Amino acid sequence: MTEVSDRTETRFRRTPGVEARAGKFPGPSLIPSLNAIQARRGWLPREELEELARSARRPRYEIEGLISFYPHFRTEPPTKVSLHVCHDLACFLRDGEARLAELRERYADDADVEVVEVSCLGRCDIAPAVAVNERPAPVSEADVLVQGARESDLGQAAPRTRAEPWANDPYASGSGVGERYAVLRALLAGELDAERIIATLKDSGLRGMGGAGFPTGQKWDLVRRTEPGSVKYAVCNADESEPGTFKDRQILATQPHLVLEGLLIGMAAVGAEEGWIFIRHEYAPEEHVLRAEIEALRAAGVVGADACGSGRRLEVDVFVSPGGYILGEETALLECMEGHRGEPRNKPPFPGTYGLHGRPTLINSVETLADVPVILQRGAQWWADQGAGESVGWKFFAVSGHVERPDVYLVPMGTTVRQLIALAGGVTGGAAVGAVQPGGASSNFIGPDQLDLPLDFDTAVKAGTMLGSGALVVLAEGTDLLAAATNVLRFFRNESCGKCVPCRVGSTKAHELLREVLESGATALGDARRQRILQLEEVMRKTSICGLGQVALGPVVSVLNLGGSTGGGLQAPKSDGASGQPVR
């Protein structure tokens, strides 16, 4: 404890503007210990928490503060069967509310079964989705799984795989650790150096694929140049929790080797010895895939105290999130890893200079890291040539909502909305497109007149939306757009960490206003309510600490714009000519 405390005090002393954080308790994070207790007992009994407080020498109120913040933790024994039902956009569009009502009625008098509404489970491809004792499934399988859970442990679900490998993978299908990790081996053997790797990433134009779009090579260069020779860390952000987003889950299940190689290359390039994959707890099948791959790497000597015989130490592990969409924000993620409540930090400083435990920290998304070994093997020019038109590289998209084949699709960056919907089999039942949310819940809705919009970072922004998390949600013509946007806003309201007033209060007030309109059966929002929404959106966008509050009302405003200046036309507009025809 003394060593950790001394290091923590030094950290606050040398870093401007963070003295207020000195009151936070130093020492190892208690999150993994709490996760372990709940995995063993099914909840967090008082005697276990008292023992943890004694053994870790931490005050009980600190532990209670963690438990009250994170939604995964339970302080009461669960029922024999926990039936979690997703209520967010992709499931909402597939009659999720009706299925939820049916399940509640069916099990209302069953003492063994608890039906709980939850935020997005990351299974939008099987919407409406449920999780029975944490085992994910489509709602059509709920009753069978409930019966199975009454009788025995359901066991772990298998991760979803593909019959054919993704086209981006440079390694032969079925190859093992010995044939993979070629770029990492070359780097550790001295055949490549960090400067060349970073230069190649800069030349390629690779940008962060988690939503921010920050140039990857520039980020790596910043972390590498910050405090050379000091302790540094690296984190893969796999806390994919935004409604409509499930592409990272598929990448982790099918290409764990590319994600881990990208992370390890990043660690070696910036000078970090320790790295983690921070994964949401709902992704247990993918967590097991990652742990198996890490064990294979350790057995082969690729990671450890003497990685690939280079004399360099590279250690990597998995950190399981205790829940909460806010943890996708990089500084909230770091707060969680340090064992605090996952509340975003004020920035600057940024993680590249002041990250985990106050040290320079490289943070990249799953897809970004998976792209790194591909680019370094095939070259920056090859990557640039893969895009459509002026765009660069490949892009994974998760497509859900009113489409025939919800799934993950790998396409050239710059593929149009229309083309992506066509890959997903077109709109369900041959209907016309009414609206599209092209970049996940954070992105603004676009109308059927924008189906030929190329999906890349800059073009999307110019069109008034964003590429975001790579989640394209399709709404058929006739869908109640205000209800859909209100559903999105409810998600942000529920997931707000509550730290800043604009986000906490603004999202609640706006949701109450919209809910009143929907419950009244009104066909128009009206000028007064519209102006109130616009005022709240401006205040939240300009004054919220993190991206959640800044974007929470954007989708609602975009729907109002699609419906006209008075807020009328609350249903998806009729198609106008060829641009709104069904895509098959």
PLM ranges: what are they?
Residues M1-R584:
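Feature of Fe-S/electron-transfer and energy-metabolism proteins
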